[in-house]
């Protein structure tokens, strides 16, 4: 049994000291948790260094920490930052390991069954194994994760109990070690040495752990005793160092044995018989035959080889759980006294809540038509209330916390002062009558100063009309609409920063990647028209777009001041006065953020993909050259992944078939 090392401390490394009001935020949050607060909110204005504050809180509390964000891009950014802050501690990355994932689905309208299809990223799989092995063996662990952390991951007790511990001088025969390795899903391969494999040369066994990317362990025997353990470079065999003791963690998170499998098969058979009787009683003979045939095949595979495609749908039986019981997840691998940080909580909490319902709807159709047993519903993400039961202490981090977070706790800590001294922008309310002419005058002032302008409208038609009007006046302007893809959007933002145009018009300017230091004016048209984009939270976020420039200003065009406007204006003015007071006391002069303008990759490819997609139906693959086919495979793969993300299973399946056909043709030509 593995024992967790509890004596390691977090060591924060940074050339910066807490600045602005980071210090007071760190102290209040740390004191709050140490005094037993279960939930706290860090409400940090844009550009105040919330991640650095999070790192300081982690270091001071010295608890294993799970940081959750709502998309892979942000998870990657946070992972990189925390790796820099904590180079001597374990910082792990945990996201879905699928490069491509099309879930099993059935479309009753067209009687189309689509099998699960996926492609696993080996590097991410290795990082997931490193995460769980770190959590089992040490306390100084920070895991940065996506919402994948609330999906099933196997029983941590079985995982821990299956760890093979080896030490110098230990009495164990070579053959017993080989059997133990096979039991935890390691494969013997004396030629192709990869993660999750071992090889044998006489009295020497080399093991490549599942959680390592380039290190392996060489175990040397003398009779039935371990004589020496060394860590080696898995590629060159060069000795890195000697080890007195090592722990080999299972090569899978779903650990099983003969007893577990026998119990699971008996339970699956019982459920199958009940479901067959139910269908027959309802006169659904096709569904009854289908579920019996499919389940019997799966059971035969599991009995013979210990695995079947879609085995995760039987996880409730494998783990001995009751119907409706939550699955084991990454959260179960943490000790009880751990800390959760929810980054961008206004977006992450709704995502955590939505996972369960989306998963259930798809599986219910498979069950209703006899493709899966009802227990497949228990292979699922956690419900929100189940996630809440895992919470020991939690910190929600956002510039605009959502209603959920605000209802969880009264303990809110503000972080208002920016280390750069930048202020929240001035806000001015002007009448709607003559708003366009007034706006043109303000735009021209900014153009003279080589600054940029954001204009937000309420309707697509108004945005288009305003764009045309400004163009007729000779103003360089672009319209950012919802049909524009991510990469193209980034190119437009880059062109704005470079000065290729001066004004960007949009309906929703709250998406990622739209922070532009060169923007000194944000104009909000029809600010008094209540609705989603004119409610308090989006208004505050929109105002924040002018907070990265020392000349930042916001003009709201409105004939009356709504409650949402008043709340947003009051909050901004309060922060601005505090920031001005701080700057005056400390002799700080606000400076516009200097941010490098980076190239946007693959922009041309994105537009080429769009053209290829439109002409895909007209193509005859036989007429393409080998090179064209290879390029087409890449293009269709990207489209397939996009279709799967949108849950357009039929389109994804059609594209997959086309890809397989192309690959077959390319392979045949090679011969």
UniProtKB/Swiss-Prot annotation:
GO cellular component: cytoplasm; excinuclease repair complex
GO terms (BP aspect): nucleotide-excision repair; SOS response
Xref: PROSITE patterns: HELICASE_ATP_BIND_1, HELICASE_CTER, UVR
Pfam families, per the entry: Helicase_C, ResIII, UVR, UvrB, UvrB_inter
Molecular function in Gene Ontology: ATP binding; ATP hydrolysis activity; DNA binding; excinuclease ABC activity
Residues annotated for ATP binding in this entry: 44-51
Known function: The UvrABC repair system catalyzes the recognition and processing of DNA lesions. A damage recognition complex composed of 2 UvrA and 2 UvrB subunits scans DNA for abnormalities. Upon binding of the UvrA(2)B(2) complex to a putative damaged site, the DNA wraps around one UvrB monomer. DNA wrap is dependent on ATP binding by UvrB and probably causes local melting of the DNA helix, facilitating insertion of UvrB beta-hairpin between the DNA strands. Then UvrB probes one DNA strand for the presence of a lesion.
Stated family: Belongs to the UvrB family.
Protein name: UvrABC system protein B
Organism: Lactobacillus johnsonii (strain CNCM I-12250 / La1 / NCC 533)
Encoding gene (name): uvrB
């Amino acid at each position: 049994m593995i024992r967790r090392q509890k004596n390691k401390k977090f060591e924060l490394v940074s050339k910066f000291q807490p600045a602005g009001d980071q210090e007071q935020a760190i102290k209040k949050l740390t004191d709050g948790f140490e005094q037993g607060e279960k939930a706290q909110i860090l409400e940090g204005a844009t550009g105040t260094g919330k991640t650095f504050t999070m790192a300081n809180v982690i270091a001071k509390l010295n608890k294993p920490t799970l940081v959750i964000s709502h998309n892979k891009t942000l998870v990657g950014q946070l992972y990189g930052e925390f790796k820099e802050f904590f180079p001597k501690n374990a910082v792990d990355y945990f996201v879905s390991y699928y490069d491509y994932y099309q879930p099993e689905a059935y479309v009753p309208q067209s009687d189309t069954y689509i099998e699960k299809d996926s492609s696993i990223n080996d590097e991410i799989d290795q990082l997931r194994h490193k995460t769980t092995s770190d959590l089992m063996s040490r306390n100084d662990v920070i895991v940065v994760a996506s919402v994948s952390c609330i999906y099933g991951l196997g029983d941590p007790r079985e995982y821990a109990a299956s760890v093979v511990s080896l030490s110098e001088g230990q009495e164990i025969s070579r053959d017993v070690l080989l059997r133990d390795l096979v039991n935890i899903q390691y494969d013997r391969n004396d030629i192709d040495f990869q993660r999750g494999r071992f090889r044998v040369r006489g009295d020497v066994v080399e093991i490549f752990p599942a959680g390592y990317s380039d290190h392996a362990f060489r175990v040397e025997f003398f009779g039935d005793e371990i004589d020496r353990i060394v860590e080696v470079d898995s590629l060159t065999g060069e000795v890195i160092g000697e080890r007195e003791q090592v722990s080999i963690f299972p090569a899978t998170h779903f650990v099983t044995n003969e007893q577990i499998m026998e119990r699971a098969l008996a339970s699956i058979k019982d459920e199958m018989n009940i479901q067959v009787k139910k269908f027959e009683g309802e006169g659904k003979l096709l569904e009854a035959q289908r579920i019996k045939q499919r389940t019997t095949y799966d059971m035969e595979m599991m009995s013979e080889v210990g695995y079947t495609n879609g085995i995760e749908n039987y996880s409730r039986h494998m783990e001995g759980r009751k119907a409706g019981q939550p699955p084991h997840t990454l959260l179960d691998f943490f000790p009880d006294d751990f800390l959760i940080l929810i980054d961008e909580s206004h977006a992450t909490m709704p995502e955590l809540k939505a996972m369960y319902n989306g998963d259930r709807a798809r599986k219910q159709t498979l069950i209703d038509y006899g493709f899966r047993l009802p227990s497949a519903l228990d292979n699922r993400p956690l419900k929100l209330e189940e996630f809440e039961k895992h919470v020991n202490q939690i910190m929600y981090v956002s510039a605009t916390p959502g209603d959920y977070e605000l209802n969880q706790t009264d303990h809110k800590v503000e972080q208002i002062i920016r280390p750069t001294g930048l202020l929240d922008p001035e806000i001015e309310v002007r009448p709607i009558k003559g708003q366009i002419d007034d706006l043109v005058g303000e735009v021209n002032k900014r153009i003279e100063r080589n600054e940029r302008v954001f204009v937000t409208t309420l309707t697509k038609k108004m945005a288009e009309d305003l764009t045309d009007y400004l163009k007729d006046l000779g103003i360089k302007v672009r319209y950012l609409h919802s049909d524009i893809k991510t990469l193209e959007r980034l190119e437009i933002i880059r062109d704005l920063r470079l000065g290729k145009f001066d004004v960007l018009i949009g309906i929703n300017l709250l998406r990622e990647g739209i922070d532009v230091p060169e923007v000194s004016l944000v104009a909000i048209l029809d600010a008094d028209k209540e609705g989603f984009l004119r409610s308090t939270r989006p208004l505050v976020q929109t105002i924040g777009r002018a907070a990265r420039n020392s000349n930042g200003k916001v003009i709201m065009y409105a004939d009356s001041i709504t409650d949402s406007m008043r709340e947003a204006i009051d909050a901004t003015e309060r922060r601005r006065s505090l920031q001005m007071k701080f700057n005056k006391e400390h002799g700080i002069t606000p400076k516009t953020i200097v941010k490098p303008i980076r190239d946007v990759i693959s922009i041309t490819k994105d537009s080429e993909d769009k053209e290829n997609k439109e002409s895909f139906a007209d193509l005859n693959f036989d007429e393409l050259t080998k090179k064209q086919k290879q390029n087409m495979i890449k293009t269709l793969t990207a489209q397939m992944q996009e279709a799967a993300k949108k849950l357009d299973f039929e389109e994804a399946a059609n594209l997959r078939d086309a890809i397989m056909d192309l690959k077959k043709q390319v392979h045949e030509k090679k011969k």
